[in-house]
Amino acid sequence: CKILEGDILLSLTGNVGRSCIAYGKNNLLNQRVAKLEPIDKGWLPFIYWMFNDSKMVSLMNNLATGAAQQNLSPVKLSKEKVTIPSESFINLFCSNTIDIFKQIILLNKQNQKLKQARDILLPRLMNRTIEVE
């Protein structure tokens, strides 16, 4: 399954219940990560914040099983009853938070570029290939 920028991913193994917004290119999904796909793509901000809510994270942690490594079953999770607000509320929420959602993606991309620059520059500074004035 191909991952597109803005897709919401959910960890199913290890640190179960951790969600993030995908960014970048050429990402693929494996069996221990779930892709959360709302029927309406405009609802991505709501889905992201819902799965980051402390009550939802707690629910997912309580559903996880396994002694050596915790595993969250998507089947078990999908059977849980969760209170969902009205469609009009979700639309209002998303229209007010879409810019924040986009900013998260942008900042993640910028952080990635800064990490790449650090990884290039730090060895050069340590080897004195370049100097800071």
Regions found by a protein language model. Give the residues of each.
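A short beta-sheet element
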Residues: C1-N52, M56, G66-A68, S73-V75
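Amphipathic alpha-helical coiled-coil/heptad-repeat segments
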Residues: K41-G42, F46-W49, V57-A67, V75-E133
